[in-house]
Amino acid sequence: MWTCLCQLCFYLLSTLAVAALSIAALVLYKTKPYPNIKRHKDEETFLDPHTIKTVTFPSLEDSPSLELSVIVPAYNEEQRLPSMLDECLAFLEQKSAGTPNFTYEVIVVSDGSQDATVSVALGYSKKHGAEKVRVLELIENRGKGGAVRMGMLSARGRNLLFADADGATKFPDYDKLEVALKQLAPEWRDDGIAIGSRAHLENDAIATRSFFRTILMHGFHFLVWLFAVRSIRDTQCGFKLFTRTTARKLFTSLHVERWAFDVELLYLAENLKLPMSEVAVRWTEIDGSKLTPFWSWLQMGRDLFMIWVRYLVGAWRIASIQKKEK
């Protein structure tokens, strides 16, 4: 009997080992090690509403010419975008008036929107000027991570913030992130990330969410910890501030373009040993979310596993390390 059990265990383990090796070989064969960042010609320019001319975006590889770039990824956000931009621009204008050397730009990235998102954003560009508000219109939907990346690659700031279009995070909390980032990285050439966090609100969220959604939330947090990021409690808050140097390293190495992109960014940051600070921010849930709890979190769980597997077997590599080695 014991002999049969041992043989059965041997066959099971052998089958699992063969399956694991097959998956690893398939992943290595079908996956490119570095991101292939393609950009349509029309995505290289923005419209200046005053001159009615198209202007070429700068590059993230250029030296900075502003203090702050705010990247706002937007997919079908004609309803929620105005209130977010109103709060954002009012805060930035007030900060600019009180601090003359504080200059900024807001880049709204329409991620293949089918509604009036582009028209709404262009209205703000016309009102405030293309020096302050620019609209990057992606030809096809890339996903939130892809939209953020395209905005980052087009930015002029010493520091770069991405902020969700729903306005769930109170924009004046930017000051908290700025203070935290300066402690990590006094200059834009230094590395650092200040990460807006809702972790302090978790108990309140549990009190108001259904039991099912609470289970999903804890399950997702566990998967993030297991497969990817262990030093940051809230990886998904859409309010993160990077130095220009750090943005170059991370967004040229990013593979995931959809919802789990935040996790890969922070996974990369941990592996590159970049300084990070998690900062509590004010956050309110806004109606109109594009996420459907079960299916979106199932997709993110799959993405987390694939992030882990691909880096583990060497199918994905970090582009910034490749550049350094050259």
Swiss-Prot record:
Q: Which GO terms describe its biological process?
A: chitin-based cuticle development; dorsal/ventral pattern formation; endoplasmic reticulum organization; gastrulation involving germ band extension; mesoderm migration involved in gastrulation; plasma membrane organization; protein N-linked glycosylation; protein O-linked glycosylation
What parts of the sequence cross the membrane?
A: 8-28
User: According to the UniProt topology, which residue ranges lie Lumenal?
Assistant: 1-7
Outcome of substituting R209W: Fails to rescue glycosylation and growth phenotypes in yeast
- Could you list this entry's UniProt keywords, alphabetically sorted: Endoplasmic reticulum, Glycosyltransferase, Membrane, Signal-anchor, Transferase, Transmembrane, Transmembrane helix
Knockout mutant characteristics: Larval lethality. Embryos lacking maternal and zygotic wol activity show segmentation, dorso-ventral patterning and gastrulation defects. As a result, germband elongation does not proceed normally and mesoderm invagination is disturbed. In these embryos, protein glycosylation is reduced by 25 percent, the ER tubules are smooth and the unfolded protein response (UPR), a transcriptional response which up-regulates genes that enable cells to cope with misfolded, endoplasmic reticulum-retained proteins, is activated.
Class of enzymatic activity (EC top level) = transferase
Q: Does the keyword Membrane apply?
A: yes
Query: CDD domains, from UniProt?
Result: DPG_synthase
Topology in the membrane?
Single-pass membrane protein
Q: What is its main location?
A: endoplasmic reticulum
Q: What is its EC number?
A: 2.4.1.117
Does Zinc appear among the keywords?
no
Q: Where in the cell is it found?
A: Endoplasmic reticulum membrane
Protein family per UniProt: Belongs to the glycosyltransferase 2 family.
Any remaining note in the record? 'Wollknaeuel' means 'ball of wool' in German.
Q: What is this protein called?
A: Dolichyl-phosphate beta-glucosyltransferase
Q: Which organism is it from?
A: Drosophila melanogaster
